[in-house]
Amino acid sequence: MAQGAMRFCSEGDCAISPPRCPRRWLPEGPVPQSPPASMYGSTGSLLRRVAGPGPRSRELGRVTAPCTPLRGPPSPRIAPSPWAPSSPTGQPPPGARSSVVIFRFVEKASVRPLNGLPAPGGLSRSWDLGGVSPPRPTPALGPGSHQKLRLEASTSDPLPAGGGSARPGTQGLLQGPPTQPQVGADGLYSSLPNGLGGPSEHLATLFRGPADTGLLNQGDIWSSPREVSSHAQRIARAKWEFFYGSLDPPSSGAKPPEQAPPSPPGVGSGQGSGVAVGRAAKYSETDLDTVPLRCYRETDIDEVLTEREEADSAIESQPSSEGLPGTARPPAPRPGPCLGPHPSLGSGNEDEDEAGGEEDVDDEVFEASEGARPGTRMPHSGPLKSPLPFLPGTSPSADGPDSFSCVFEAILESHRAKGTSYTSLASLEALASPGPTQSPFFTFELPPQPPAPRPDPPAPAPLAPLEPDSGTSSAADGPWTQRGEEEEAEAGAKQTPGRDPPSPCHSEDSFGLGAAPLGSEPPLNQLVSDSDSELDSTERLALGSTDTLSNGQKADLEAAQRLAKRLYRLDGFRKADVARHLGKNNDFSKLVAGEYLKFFVFTGMTLDQALRVFLKELALMGETQERERVLAHFSQRYFQCNPGALSSEDGAHTLTCALMLLNTDLHGHNIAETHDLRRLHRYLEGLNEGGDFPRELLKALYSSIKNEKLQWAIDEEELRRSLSELADPNPKVIKRVSGGSGSGSSPFLDLTPEPGAAVYKHGALVRKVHADPDCRKTPRGKRGWKNFHGILKGMILYLQKEEYQPGKALSEAELKNAISIHHALATRASDYSKRPHVFYLRTADWRVFLFQAPSLEQMQSWITRINVVAAMFSAPPFPAAVSSQKKFSRPLLPSAATRLSQEEQVRTHEAKLKAMASELREHRATQLTKKARGKEAEEQRQKEAYLEFEKSRYGTYAALLRVKLKAGSEELDAVEAAVAQAGGTEDGLPPPHSSPSLPANTSSQPRAQCSDSEARAGAGSGRWKP
């Protein structure tokens, strides 16, 4: 047996304090503050029949032996506000209640049936909520056993009833003539089952005459604070019969208790008549064969009675709140003896009680009774109400226990099933095997909460709450706090989505003590940070249920190892996810990165070789600081594997970042100025621990990066998805494909593949990049001719190394070489004389390519088909940007296919042709009347070049579509034949050698070049050199 305080929260959790040291044989000590009385009038039971509330419900098991509510009077010296811990004003919140119940736990060694026979319906010592059960037959006791049972009530169960006192002639559960107890050591301690002895002078006050006790009002103090009530005598007798069997012979008849009629005034000690109502109590025959036999250690009777008797006066003086609204209560004279205890609250489960002992045999219950209103009679018919606040979502019913009992049973059973202690004691065995400094009582406090809406709710006057003592205040610092955090972290990870997690058991607020001490740690599942919220579902899955992080700082090494292994093996992750997990700024990500880099062995490698190996395993993506963190982890691992290669880890990190920048400068697009070795050496001066890096090392690294650029992996899954979309004949969604992270201006960027598009032409081509976007100069090392096999599929010209195969998927490099031909124009390169059968292809972003065909016919076929496809599917352009400046800007050309029909497309192209011709005339007329200089003249030249090119392009589109419509066929072979037959004059088709952007008369020029106007027409582009 042990003593402590437990608080029940509204979510169903509880917290129990370490046991208090009982004051042995010190009746003169201070009386502790009495608990509030709102729980005394309620009932509760620990039942095993149903599952506990909540999403993780399971069958509840037996936890404790029968226990008895411990009740006591309020201390006349201490009377703080009952709501002091939670309300600064001392007033209770509206509709809120706070209940404290003190229980006594006894572990039974063995159970014997009543009088050698099992009790009918099983013995279930419970009072459930909801009504009054019919009285059960109780065996009568002879006169010889009355004295012993009364002494047992004083020693074994010192629980005085709520206002009831023992009087001669009381009719109720105890039968037989009254006998005056013998106050002696032999007479008292001979009845104790464990043979405990103690001073007898403190027990003399237990048996006083009935005239010393009167019926008092609320707030009064007992006139005789040391009397043994009839309720305590019945409890003692029931316990004696429960543990040791009945003293009556088995043949003794049992008759149900009867309600004692009110005694007329003047009977006994001359006081007024009262109401004596018998109550029935059923006791549980539980299966405790596995419990070893133990002696029962008892506490000092004087101490217990002194602490509890004053509370009974306040409880007895309260008006009863258990009666039904509207129930007629006959008035009774105020001065009168309490002839009987409060009638028992029925369980409301008559069907279960009459069904036999199949369910009741496993029930272990506790009960809390309420003192009856003085001088009032409560009928046995009709359900009674209890001030016990119901937990949310639960209500008492005839098919299951009340919410208080169900939640309490679930808490104790769950902690016992986990093999942990729900108190600061070592295990549950300590409850039944107390030490010499432990008390046999537990205090459980229910938090104030608004009750469920009920008609005419009773309003009992609350008593002062129980002040937490030293054992209660140190509950959060007990040895079970850390274990409880781990269990709560596990429970929080397994919590069903959409459900609120239960409140922590070890919260200081559950005791009403305010803020937690500085030394205690908050529960893990209540701390959420930005870094923890960044974890996606895959990372949480890798962490497991017990690897919850707190503010990104409490990392679990085992979880980091599991996640790093899965990232390296790409088990449930993509390559694009690896850098995102390694680049976070928290301790867990650092652990994951350290474990991930352990899979790489860079021993004996140079820095550039190790960097190439590392970048092939992940796609280095994300923001600059995220990528820098990933490179920092790589540098740390490289220095661990090669401690002698560089002077420090910081030096390795500096060189790694320098190589990344050098790779961009040497191989990136649109870089006006490249770095050389001298500039690299100048940039790295003094960054090697205050010194310079060896020149030979920098020279080797520079040569390696210049000869072979760094390649890192792209998202293969996204690449496969894009290829599958190209091969899917019936797509539902068209997604924009992004190019690899290594080329900033790849032709494959911003392409919208057309799944299921028709293949219009394929054949061998030789390509040369003549100008980058906006007609910028292409670097000299990227201008060479390369052989490809061209595939015109939809609005995209794919260039692949191998010959075209219809069922073969395209590779990454082939996708990067693709060119979109929306708003493009192909013309014969008559000005280029180095190679035969060459034609130009200018794209919408003003890139220029040179293509060489195997023959003249193939060149004409490629030019015609590219222009026809562009004319068929190019959508009308968007308006140009509007600005307060007069700077010229080209309109936006959409890459999506048009939704117009071919007739409407022809009319659109013709309208744009007329508009461009009219605008060109106006622009030239403006130039003749106004001589511009400087930037204005440059802008006028750019606009004129643009208008000339657009007029030629729309004229070509309109002419080709008119020929196609006149041919009346969708086959491009027929269109080619019609174009060749027209000769380019009848329908206004421009000659194949003409080019609106590249001058046709270039005999004096050795090679093709952009004109000055075209070079200036590129937005911000530089001028081409002749």
Swiss-Prot record:
The keyword Cell membrane applies. Residues 1000-1012 have a biased composition (Polar residues). One of its GO terms (molecular function) is guanyl-nucleotide exchange factor activity. The modification Phosphoserine is found at S126, S156, S722. GO terms for biological process: regulation of ARF protein signal transduction. Residues 758-871 form the PH domain. Residues 25-97, 126-196, 246-403, 436-538, 924-943, 978-1026 are annotated as: Disordered. InterPro entries: PH-like_dom_sf, PH_9, PH_dom-spectrin-type, PH_domain, Sec7_C_sf, Sec7_dom, Sec7_dom_sf. This is PH and SEC7 domain-containing protein 1.
